[in-house]
């Protein structure tokens, strides 16, 4: 695919007598289809496509954003040459970072090693598939010329940008608090990118949770009251809530759900870093198992810290109109009538739910990632937005399915003091009661609205997350 480009426009080591400006000028003339001395975005798209040059996602727009210095919507030769020179320098650094033994070639084992350092585990077979897409001469190694030719018009500037595609990011918020925290590189920590990404994720979570709050409240109502009447379906549940408290009541408890994002994220991130240090030796990179254990323990720590807010959210969601004037009034009444212990009702099933959720979520995501790399990573390791969102949504849904009975018991334990004549049962007692009176389906009451909110939550949080990253300077506009 790249032989024409290598042999005519970008000569290899055997033809280095041709100066870079001449190379760039020849290529520029090929792209300037109407010969007016400038290249617009449509000429760039058509020209690169006709030359068979591989492009990254939204490559043309990114090239123009970076290269069009005077912002006239066109690239003249000077702008074109400057962009390619600057981009080649960045790609040279990326090439050197992958070439671990400094022999001037990248091998499959070096790709595996480099990706492992950055937190992405792939097999050597998967690395060979990626290598084949870049390797033009069939040697199963990639030299500098092949690397440069492949990435010449791909705005990805370093290997870490490729890894960011495959990060199982918590920027995608579906309203659950059991996910494993994000992994940040040392450069991201030093540059302050980490807190910007966490802030972007927090804002995305707030918008996403607020947008899907009616479905979340319906889920809680079905978990708590569903056993009383088989008639509480989705339509009937919404009708009942609106009749009791009006449209605004659909968002009851959402304020607490949004407020707890900040302390929970902060504690989880801090705890995750501490547990990683305990589980790995200095200088050693964290593996998938250590990440799972550290993430689960960090989640448990964060949940311990903010759990009273989980109880408040449930009480507010289940409460009747006028029962509580707000979060602080609810806390005051619980403390007065039930004591401090009420703020940790349902804590044990909540804690137990972290392991199946986080473990299955991570395992399914890794499985989907491996499947994609094995079967579809022929031209790029960038899977595209839809694949990433689909993998994230599916893995999270599987995690929810496994941990849902524990989540339901937790919610009932949090709310059972509000239900008249309801016995105050512990976790085992509630499981027995539900199974004896409602059967296995009783452990999954409310799961339909819970699944219904996954797709809108993923879509909304992704859009807000990406826009917030641009606003905060994490990514370019």
UniProtKB/Swiss-Prot annotation:
Electroneutral antiporter that mediates the transport of adenyl nucleotides through the inner mitochondrial membrane. Originally identified as an ATP-magnesium/inorganic phosphate antiporter, it also acts as a broad specificity adenyl nucleotide antiporter. By regulating the mitochondrial matrix adenyl nucleotide pool could adapt to changing cellular energetic demands and indirectly regulate adenyl nucleotide-dependent metabolic pathways. In vitro, a low activity is also observed with guanyl and pyrimidine nucleotides. The modification N6-succinyllysine is found at residues 320, 437. It comes from the Eukaryota. Residues 174-477 are annotated as: C-terminal transmembrane transporter domain. Residues 1-173 are annotated as: Regulatory N-terminal domain. Ca(2+) 1 binds at residues 32, 34, 36, 38, 43. Keywords: Acetylation, Antiport, Calcium, Membrane, Metal-binding, Mitochondrion, Mitochondrion inner membrane, Repeat, Transmembrane, Transmembrane helix, Transport. PANTHER family: SOLUTE CARRIER FAMILY 25. Activated by an increase in cytosolic calcium levels that induce a conformational change of the N-terminal regulatory domain, uncapping the channel and allowing transport. Inhibited by bathophenanthroline, mersalyl, p-hydroxymercuribenzoate, bromcresol purple and tannic acid. It catalyses: Mg(2+)(out) + phosphate(in) + ATP(out) = Mg(2+)(in) + phosphate(out) + ATP(in); ADP(out) + phosphate(in) + H(+)(out) = ADP(in) + phosphate(out) + H(+)(in); AMP(out) + phosphate(in) = AMP(in) + phosphate(out); phosphate(in) + ATP(out) + 2 H(+)(out) = phosphate(out) + ATP(in) + 2 H(+)(in). Monomer. The gene is SLC25A24. It comes from Bos taurus (Bovine). Ca(2+) 3 binds at residues 99, 101, 103, 105, 110. This is Mitochondrial adenyl nucleotide antiporter SLC25A24.
């Amino acid at each position: 695919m790249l032989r024409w480009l290598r042999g005519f426009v970008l000569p290899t080591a055997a033809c280095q007598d041709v100066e870079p400006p001449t190379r760039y000028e020849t290529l520029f003339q090929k792209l300037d289809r109407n010969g007016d001395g400038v290249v617009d975005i449509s000429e760039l798209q058509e020209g690169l496509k006709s030359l068979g040059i591989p492009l990254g996602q939204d490559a043309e727009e990114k090239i123009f954003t970076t290269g069009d210095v005077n912002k006239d919507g066109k690239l003249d030769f000077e702008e074109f040459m400057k962009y390619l020179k600057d981009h080649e320098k960045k790609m040279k650094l990326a090439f050197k970072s992958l070439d671990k033994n400094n022999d001037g070639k990248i091998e499959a084992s070096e790709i595996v090693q480099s990706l492992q350092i950055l937190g992405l585990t792939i097999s050597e077979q998967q690395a060979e598939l990626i290598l084949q897409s870049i390797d033009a001469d069939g040697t199963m190694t990639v030299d500098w010329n092949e690397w440069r030719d492949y990435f010449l018009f791909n705005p990805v500037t370093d290997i870490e940008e490729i890894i960011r595609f495959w990060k199982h990011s918590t920027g995608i918020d579906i309203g659950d608090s059991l996910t494993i925290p994000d992994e940040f590189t040392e450069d991201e920590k030093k540059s302050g990118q980490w807190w910007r990404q966490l802030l972007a994720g927090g804002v995305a979570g707030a918008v996403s949770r607020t947008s899907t709050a009616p479905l979340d409240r319906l889920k809680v109502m079905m978990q708590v009251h569903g056993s009383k009447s088989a008639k509480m379906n989705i339509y009937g549940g919404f009708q009942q809530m609106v009749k009791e408290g009006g449209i605004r009541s659909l968002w009851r408890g959402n304020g607490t759900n949004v407020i707890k994002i900040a302390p929970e994220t902060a504690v989880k991130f801090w705890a995750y870093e501490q547990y990683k240090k305990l589980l790995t030796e200095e200088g050693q990179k964290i593996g998938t198992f250590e990440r799972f254990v550290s993430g689960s323990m960090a989640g448990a720590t964060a949940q311990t810290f903010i759990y009273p807010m989980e109880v408040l959210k449930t009480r507010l969601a289940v409460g009747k109109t006028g029962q509580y004037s707000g979060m602080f009034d609810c806390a005051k009444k619980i403390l007065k009538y039930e004591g401090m212990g009420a703020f940790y009702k349902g804590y044990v099933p909540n804690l137990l739910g972290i392991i199946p959720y986080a473990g299955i979520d991570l395992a399914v995501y890794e499985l989907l990632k491996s499947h994609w790399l094995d079967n579809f990573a022929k031209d790029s390791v960038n899977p595209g937005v839809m694949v990433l969102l689909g993998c994230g949504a599916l893995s999270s849904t599987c995690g929810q399915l496994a941990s849902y009975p524990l989540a339901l018991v937790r919610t009932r334990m949090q709310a059972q003091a509000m239900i008249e004549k309801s016995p105050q049962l512990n976790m085992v007692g509630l499981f027995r009661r539900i199974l004896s009176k409602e059967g296995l389906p009783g452990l999954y009451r409310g799961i339909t609205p819970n699944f219904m909110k996954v797709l809108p939550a993923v879509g909304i949080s992704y859009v807000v997350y990406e826009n917030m990253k641009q606003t905060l300077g994490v990514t370019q506009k």
